[in-house]
Amino acid sequence: MSRFENIVLNVPHSSNCLPCNSGWSNLAELDKEIRKWTDWHTNILFNPSKELRSKIIPCSFEYSRFYVDVERLEYDPLEKIGQGIVYTDFNELHRDVDDFLREHCVRLYESYISRLACFIDKNTLLIDCHSFPSDLSDVDIC
Protein backbone atom coordinates (compact mmCIF):
# COMPACT_ATOMS: atom_id res chain seq x y z
CA MET A 1 0.00 0.00 0.00
CA SER A 2 1.40 3.37 -0.99
CA ARG A 3 1.75 6.21 1.44
CA PHE A 4 -0.27 9.37 0.91
CA GLU A 5 1.62 12.64 0.59
CA ASN A 6 -1.26 14.80 1.80
CA ILE A 7 -4.41 14.47 3.85
CA VAL A 8 -7.47 16.64 3.23
CA LEU A 9 -10.03 16.93 6.02
CA ASN A 10 -13.47 17.65 4.58
CA VAL A 11 -15.57 19.33 7.30
CA PRO A 12 -18.88 20.07 5.52
CA HIS A 13 -21.42 20.39 8.34
CA SER A 14 -19.77 22.12 11.29
CA SER A 15 -21.45 25.49 10.79
CA ASN A 16 -24.81 26.59 12.10
CA CYS A 17 -24.65 29.84 10.11
CA LEU A 18 -27.84 30.61 8.21
CA PRO A 19 -28.34 33.93 6.38
CA CYS A 20 -31.54 35.77 7.30
CA ASN A 21 -32.84 35.52 3.72
CA SER A 22 -32.66 31.72 3.68
CA GLY A 23 -36.30 31.15 2.73
CA TRP A 24 -37.25 28.86 5.64
CA SER A 25 -40.76 29.42 6.96
CA ASN A 26 -40.47 28.38 10.63
CA LEU A 27 -37.15 29.54 12.04
CA ALA A 28 -37.88 28.38 15.60
CA GLU A 29 -38.43 24.78 14.47
CA LEU A 30 -35.55 25.03 12.01
CA ASP A 31 -33.26 26.04 14.87
CA LYS A 32 -34.06 22.73 16.60
CA GLU A 33 -33.09 20.81 13.46
CA ILE A 34 -29.91 22.85 13.03
CA ARG A 35 -28.93 22.11 16.64
CA LYS A 36 -29.49 18.39 16.06
CA TRP A 37 -27.90 18.03 12.63
CA THR A 38 -24.85 20.30 12.92
CA ASP A 39 -21.60 18.37 13.30
CA TRP A 40 -20.61 20.37 16.36
CA HIS A 41 -16.92 21.11 16.96
CA THR A 42 -15.66 19.05 14.00
CA ASN A 43 -13.96 22.19 12.67
CA ILE A 44 -11.99 22.25 15.95
CA LEU A 45 -11.51 18.50 16.38
CA PHE A 46 -10.15 18.14 12.85
CA ASN A 47 -7.93 21.22 12.88
CA PRO A 48 -4.26 20.26 12.58
CA SER A 49 -1.50 22.17 14.30
CA LYS A 50 0.39 24.79 12.28
CA GLU A 51 3.33 22.40 11.95
CA LEU A 52 1.16 19.79 10.22
CA ARG A 53 -0.78 22.12 7.92
CA SER A 54 1.63 21.63 5.04
CA LYS A 55 0.52 17.97 4.87
CA ILE A 56 -2.91 18.00 6.54
CA ILE A 57 -5.33 20.47 5.01
CA PRO A 58 -8.70 21.24 6.64
CA CYS A 59 -11.52 22.38 4.37
CA SER A 60 -14.64 23.61 6.18
CA PHE A 61 -17.88 24.99 4.76
CA GLU A 62 -19.02 28.26 6.29
CA TYR A 63 -22.79 27.72 6.17
CA SER A 64 -25.24 25.25 7.66
CA ARG A 65 -26.36 22.31 5.55
CA PHE A 66 -29.81 23.88 5.83
CA TYR A 67 -28.56 26.69 3.59
CA VAL A 68 -26.44 24.61 1.20
CA ASP A 69 -25.49 20.95 1.63
CA VAL A 70 -22.07 20.58 0.03
CA GLU A 71 -22.13 16.81 0.53
CA ARG A 72 -24.93 16.26 -1.94
CA LEU A 73 -24.37 15.33 -5.55
CA GLU A 74 -25.35 17.61 -8.39
CA TYR A 75 -28.18 15.24 -9.32
CA ASP A 76 -28.70 13.72 -5.89
CA PRO A 77 -31.66 11.33 -5.55
CA LEU A 78 -32.61 13.11 -2.31
CA GLU A 79 -33.50 16.15 -4.41
CA LYS A 80 -36.83 14.39 -5.04
CA ILE A 81 -37.76 14.78 -1.37
CA GLY A 82 -36.40 18.32 -1.04
CA GLN A 83 -33.00 17.39 0.39
CA GLY A 84 -30.58 17.95 -2.46
CA ILE A 85 -27.91 20.64 -2.56
CA VAL A 86 -30.56 23.22 -1.68
CA TYR A 87 -33.00 21.83 0.88
CA THR A 88 -36.64 22.80 0.34
CA ASP A 89 -38.24 20.34 2.78
CA PHE A 90 -36.98 18.71 5.96
CA ASN A 91 -39.33 16.81 8.23
CA GLU A 92 -42.28 19.22 8.66
CA LEU A 93 -40.32 22.30 7.57
CA HIS A 94 -40.63 24.02 4.18
CA ARG A 95 -38.39 26.49 2.42
CA ASP A 96 -39.36 28.80 -0.44
CA VAL A 97 -36.44 29.02 -2.86
CA ASP A 98 -36.69 31.45 -5.76
CA ASP A 99 -34.35 31.36 -8.76
CA PHE A 100 -32.02 34.01 -7.32
CA LEU A 101 -31.58 32.13 -4.02
CA ARG A 102 -31.11 28.78 -5.79
CA GLU A 103 -28.44 30.23 -8.10
CA HIS A 104 -26.65 31.82 -5.15
CA CYS A 105 -26.68 28.53 -3.22
CA VAL A 106 -25.45 26.56 -6.24
CA ARG A 107 -22.57 29.03 -6.66
CA LEU A 108 -21.61 28.51 -3.01
CA TYR A 109 -21.75 24.73 -3.55
CA GLU A 110 -19.61 24.92 -6.69
CA SER A 111 -17.10 27.19 -4.98
CA TYR A 112 -16.68 24.77 -2.07
CA ILE A 113 -16.36 21.73 -4.35
CA SER A 114 -13.75 23.58 -6.45
CA ARG A 115 -11.81 24.58 -3.34
CA LEU A 116 -11.86 21.00 -2.08
CA ALA A 117 -10.80 19.66 -5.49
CA CYS A 118 -7.79 22.00 -5.57
CA PHE A 119 -6.28 20.11 -2.66
CA ILE A 120 -6.84 16.61 -4.04
CA ASP A 121 -4.68 14.56 -6.37
CA LYS A 122 -3.76 10.87 -6.67
CA ASN A 123 -1.47 11.16 -3.62
CA THR A 124 -4.13 12.60 -1.32
CA LEU A 125 -6.20 10.87 1.33
CA LEU A 126 -9.61 12.55 1.73
CA ILE A 127 -11.19 12.14 5.16
CA ASP A 128 -14.84 13.07 5.61
CA CYS A 129 -15.21 14.55 9.11
CA HIS A 130 -18.51 14.29 10.99
CA SER A 131 -19.98 13.91 14.46
CA PHE A 132 -23.32 12.41 15.42
CA PRO A 133 -26.05 13.27 17.92
CA SER A 134 -26.39 11.10 21.01
CA ASP A 135 -29.82 10.00 19.74
CA LEU A 136 -28.98 8.06 16.58
CA SER A 137 -32.55 7.07 15.70
CA ASP A 138 -32.65 9.41 12.67
CA VAL A 139 -29.03 9.07 11.58
CA ASP A 140 -27.93 6.92 8.67
CA ILE A 141 -24.38 5.73 9.32
CA CYS A 142 -22.80 3.98 6.37
Give short role names for the model-derived ranges:
Residues 1-126, 131-142:
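N-terminal catalytic or cofactor-binding beta/alpha core of small enzyme domains
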